[in-house]
Amino acid sequence: MAAAVLQGVPVVTSDIDFWIGLPEREHDRVLRICHQLGAKIVTDHIVELADGLELNFTYRVDGLSGFKTEFERAKRLLWLNRRVAVLPLERLIKSKEAVGRAKDRVHLVYLRQALKLKR
C-alpha cells in the first residue's frame, strides 16, 4: 500500500512491497544484496532494514500484466529523494480485486475513493 500512500490515499502501511522483475527462483540474488546492505533476512521474501522497516519482495502480482508491461505503465514519483516507479491507483485496484482477501476489500474502499477524487 506504500504506492497508494505516495499517491495520496489516506491509509497506513507498516511495510513496503517491491515487485521484482526477476523469476522467483532468483530470490537468493535479491536477498544476498539486501544482506550485503545490512538487512536482516526474515523469510525468502521479507527483509528488515536496520531502522525496522520491513520490505516485502514479490515476483508476480495477481490480476496484472507482466512486470515489463506494468513497469512501463508505472507512475514515477519522488520517494526518499529518489524517483521510483509505482503502480497507478487503477492497477492497484485491479490487483486487489484479483486477490480478494478481506484486507484487500477494505483497501479497495480507500483506493476507489481516492481515484474518484483525483478524477
Predicted features, each with a name:
Residues 1-119:
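Compositionally biased terminal segments of proteins
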